[in-house]
């Protein structure tokens, strides 16, 4: 309560204002914000209004539509201003009052008899909202008071207690109202009718503020009336009206009247029951069960009966709880549950109905059919009290929707105990019908507990508790209605216990559909039988309420903004807010469009959709129907269509509802490739898309409050009929889940740990989430779920933990979990793993390397730092230069150094003869790159897929170029994807691709000079055995016009020369050159493992393996120790096929030698049969030998070489070389070998070609110079290409 000491000293000075009359429904003075600050006004402070008449005292509020400029204007209600004597536009002086007295009691008087009668009918509304209309009062003042939106009365302030010039109404102020009755009219209502008349208008007992209706100058023997002024003249008052009024008040507050006379036992309760049934209420209508509680449930002790198990609360659809709450009315009715379409279908299957009946049950349901089909449900009806909130709105809804098909008239709230006992699930549909049976008075009751009671409790204790409960729950005018058996909860020593309250009949005929009344008065002549032994309680294991096992939006991470915007769309579609109901009532439900959530596999689109449904279920009280389309894939079209129809019918039945079609693209999507357009699955998807489109059209025409959410991998993966811009726009809100960035990955990881372990993440002191998020680039939501499981497994494998609370994860656990883990988004992406090469394995190209590091490597290493740059980062680089200068090698090295995923695309492999397939291939490759980001997308031979537009007769490359332009510089842009392109003919590329924002950085890879050639030779020969006389400086000086690829070929030829020289020096007989060459090929590892001349600037793995250089012929033939190696490759059955031959026999049949090695090896006796036979292959699945083609022989030789190298490295043959034994000749490359090889090797690019490339690149770098040299002149108006 505001005390006068708090307001002491508040305010100061005054201000002259202009009075403006308004239609506000209150007695406040509305002041602008500037004037409030000027007068230093406090809340609930009084203001003195001074003008030519007697000053007035008013309360103030701050106006919301005043402008900051202009004169001071004070707005006031027109009726208030006129009663005070103010004029519209007049000048008054406002002065803040420093002291305000809180009134303990205020005497008021209606201004006329009409005001008194209106006050009697709307006493509750006045009590509830009086403080919202007036706070400051003063004697002899007349104020208007609004009892509803259109009706107001005038009251005059008679006196204030304590006496003061003005005072403030508080919540505990007693309001004494003097009646103003008509003299010549007598009230002829009976006592019961008078009580009933007042009871139905009673609204809510507001805490603290209690209204006392008193009269002056009444007879001294009237109960409950006090005399306040004996000297005043006697006012004629209708004594019967006042007496009935006070009897009503005594009944409401459970006051026991001293003189209650009844003509017959129970007649009063029966008459009250009949009077309630005579009210005009919308009985025999259909309502939807909701979980939101109406205003009437919050009433105090006077209406505590409404809290009990026997009352339900009905209110209209658009009831606003924060607005003025309407008064409620109490009646009795029968409640029966109606079966939903899904329940009817289940019942049909159980009853094995005829085909005609089954067809009838599957037809759409309307309100008339519902009423006729459920007459048999009357036997299961329950009679109870019905509390009607907003009765006027419900009656208006019946009038306005008389010619419109409306399923539900309003909403009904049923207490959980009563709802579960009646087997009514949430959001079910019930029908309330009038009670046509006259109630009876029970003569005997039986109370029996449904659970064990304390041993020291007695029957009298149970009776006492039951009598107390009945007194608090019922009154004479509001008796309790029970059927044959009810379940109630009584307060015992051990808390609330459930009891069975049943009627004891004297004969069996009384059990036919009777209802009974109970009240404290009737209980005096009713016998109560108490049984202390608990009755057998039937265990009902089935849960009738539909529980959504979904996560909330707050439990997800990385999709907060996306979830909020999606929930906003669903909220507006279901008219979940007042603004939506005012502005979007014509486009509610599916008319507002469906929501489509797209994202890659494992991105969390289904989890997000379920979380949105969970929020709609909790906040909007919406029913949720989920259809898992993945489970419907492969079924017949009729079954899928029937499942969708049942789901939508169930949603309409329980509206407002949300229908979730999870993975819709699996049953109504496009084929993966154009070749499958006429496959059976594609035809079924098309038919299903048509059926779903027609179904949605039908429900849109019905105007139902149903929202639709669908998930798919992309908008393009759905059938075009569902996402078409023409016809019905089904999906008007599309939300795409992007791959998470580092901050979002940290949020997702934190929430996954919380959901898994149900603990506080702050207790994991040794867990660095930022570090784990940085190491999980390219991960999506599902990957984090698996990663946390792997981390938990790693923790449990290191330490035995008994409870979940003791489980503490660390960064080490996640590091172990990341080993060998491939994210789901990368499993379907064909990534290319670059070779294990670093910058130290590249010779020359220093400037190019620095550009790549600044553009790609540093932003990938420090993303937070580069994210703060105000300019857009470059994401596209074109590498151009002559063949063999190391362009492809640079792409692989930068991918390895930056630790990003690498996707390599050869130009021609994107082109297709089908229309649209090439563009789709370009889109797919960028989608793969987005899924694998951070990623480097490398286009080799770029000129083959992006030539100048207009030069292709088919138009395929033109469409590819257009698609590349869209992907490289689209509206959404590339995030985390760098595009590298390599070409030797940049002049052939469409210039539009080389403009800023696309491949805006063109880097020239020049041919190596002498210094660069020396670096390349050092890198390539790093693992080769070189003799001491080798002078690479001299080799670099005499290799002009050699590229990196040419230098690699030079070392390769020098290696062959060294091999030939070693064979000759070993005393071998002269043989053909092809034999020697073939032998060397079988004993060497090639410098260039993969084809492609651009990988030539350096290669650290291309050296000759020392373990394979030894020329001892015992290594060529497999001995017994290496027998298992051949079994590993050729299969386990080759031994049985060859018999128990020796190793030489096995070698002669299984060893795969070079195809050219068909002659005798010189100096190797006894081995003639070894290489004379053609290579064959024996496997476990085939009998006999299989002839190999040339390609299969080459592949077989390469695989055997790899197996030999791995086997020898594991068996430690290198170490065995140092053991005592025969001395093996070592291979070494000398200067003579290099010079001899140089004589046989020539550059791959001639001098004329070098000149052409030089002119070409010069003109590409300086386009103006090219135009000047060409001398081309353009005439005005001449048509030229913009390319």
From Swiss-Prot:
It is linked to Peroxisome biogenesis disorder complementation group 1: A peroxisomal disorder arising from a failure of protein import into the peroxisomal membrane or matrix. The peroxisome biogenesis disorders (PBD group) are genetically heterogeneous with at least 14 distinct genetic groups as concluded from complementation studies. Include disorders are: Zellweger syndrome (ZWS), neonatal adrenoleukodystrophy (NALD), infantile Refsum disease (IRD), and classical rhizomelic chondrodysplasia punctata (RCDP). Its main location: cytoplasm. Homooligomer; homooligomerizes in the cytosol, interaction with PEX6 promotes dissociation of the homooligomer. Interacts with PEX6; forming the PEX1-PEX6 AAA ATPase complex, which is composed of a heterohexamer formed by a trimer of PEX1-PEX6 dimers. Interacts indirectly with PEX26, via its interaction with PEX6. One of its GO terms (biological process) is protein import into peroxisome matrix, receptor recycling. The lineage of its organism: Eukaryota, Metazoa, Chordata, Craniata, Vertebrata. CDD domains: RecA-like_PEX1_r2. Changing residue 970 to A: In PBD1A; impaired protein import into peroxisomes. Pfam families: AAA (PF00004), AAA_lid_3 (PF17862), PEX-1N (PF09262), PEX-2N (PF09263). SUPFAM superfamilies: ADC-like, Cdc48 domain 2-like, P-loop containing nucleoside triphosphate hydrolases. One of its GO terms (molecular function) is ATP hydrolysis activity. It catalyses: ATP + H2O = ADP + phosphate + H(+). It comes from Homo sapiens. Coiled coil: none annotated. SMART domains: AAA (SM00382). Component of the PEX1-PEX6 AAA ATPase complex, a protein dislocase complex that mediates the ATP-dependent extraction of the PEX5 receptor from peroxisomal membranes, an essential step for PEX5 recycling. Specifically recognizes PEX5 monoubiquitinated at 'Cys-11', and pulls it out of the peroxisome lumen through the PEX2-PEX10-PEX12 retrotranslocation channel. Extraction by the PEX1-PEX6 AAA ATPase complex is accompanied by unfolding of the TPR repeats and release of bound cargo from PEX5. Its EC number is 3.6.4.-. It is found in: Cytoplasm, Cytosol; Peroxisome membrane. This is Peroxisomal ATPase PEX1. Residues 346-367, 1260-1283 are annotated as: Disordered. Changing residue 887 to E: In A2 mutant; abolished ATP-binding; decreased interaction with PEX6; decreased localization to peroxisomal membranes. Changing residue 949 to W: In PBD1A; impaired protein import into peroxisomes. Keywords: Amelogenesis imperfecta, ATP-binding, Cytoplasm, Deafness, Disease variant, Hydrolase, Membrane, Nucleotide-binding, Peroxisome, Peroxisome biogenesis, Peroxisome biogenesis disorder, Phosphoprotein, Protein transport, Repeat, Transport, Zellweger syndrome. One of its GO terms (cellular component) is peroxisomal membrane. Signal peptide: none annotated. Changing residue 989 to T: In PBD1B and HMLR1.
